[in-house]
From Swiss-Prot:
Entry's localization field: Cytoplasm, Cytoskeleton
Organism: Oxytricha trifallax (Sterkiella histriomuscorum)
Domain of life: Eukaryota
Molecular-function GO terms, alphabetical: ATP binding; hydrolase activity
PANTHER family hit by this protein: ACTIN
Protein family per UniProt: Belongs to the actin family.
Major localisation: cytoplasm
The protein's name in its UniProt record: Actin, cytoplasmic
Amino acid sequence: MSDQQTCVIDNGSGVVKAGFAGEDAPRAVFPSIVGRPKNVSALIGVDSASEYLGDEAQQKRGVLKIFYPIEHGIVKDWDDMEKIWNHTFYVELRVQPDEHPILLTEAPLNPKTNREKMTQIMFETFNVPALYVAIQAVLSLYSAGRTTGIVCDAGDGVTHTVPIYEGFSIPHAVSRIQLAGRDLTTFLAKLLTERGYNFTSSAELEIVRDIKEKLCFVALDYESALKQSHDSSQFEKNYELPDGKVITIGSERFRCPEYLFKPLEMNGRELDSIQDLTYKSIQECDVDVRRDLYQNIILSGGTTMYEGIGERLLKEIENRAPKSINVKVIASPDRRFAVWRGGSTLTSLSTFASMWITKEDYDENGASIVHRKCI
């Protein structure tokens, strides 16, 4: 199998990252969405397919109803998921899946039935020669060059904190909150409404997402930043809308991601903050490994891309950790693709060859083989 290039596919709630093992970055990055016309006549004479996938669905989203097959990190609609994989292989990567070993990623605590369903679809629908399913956070840790640490992985649909010791996640200490990128986009839209800008349709929320990604940052000291924003215009930035109109945003730039640190105060949600989530996960682990975890807090995923987030998380964790411990937060510049890169690295190792689930393994044991070979 060594002569067949491995396809690495990281399926996120919001974005699919796909490419080939051994490369530094994914070849294809596209929205994890399926779009169907709201009413068929709206698209007649344009290009009336019954459904659109990825970037094309994104471009036409004004006239489409958008479906996300992955919700909060977990596949909920297998028919649409199969379409996304089909699109990944044949359109984005332009490969025949039966000619390539496939590495798929999964959320921590992915239900057993889901792991089996992924395995079944890959071998039976796509006829792949070999498969491996890896936990996203473990791959992020590998991409940071470590085998022990705690990964705070915040994507579009869910945020996880996953303690990992010597390459294995510690399942009982994994924590998750349903607060991630999509929630921050909606929250920013709410904040902009207070300024008199209304963004409500799905196409308009895409604009808000772009504003969020380009202009938002995390304040090291929120109260101080808020006071400064009242006293001066230093945080104000302009943003040009697609129609050429220019809007100004100020304190919203740091009030939006503050939601991660103060979910109750900012938006009335009784959830753990990302600092409490991280601290709780570490405290759930054996006392002997805690120091190693505090010294290797790895940020991963698109929702950790805000400027200032690493410094703020460090400050918050230092306030909670034992004073004798030197806390360290690692925020690599390309952490948006950390999971994918970890998969690319892992499958390139010569020692990985024995880890694949082969077609023979599947034929002999069925889908449950995934629980034995992909721990």
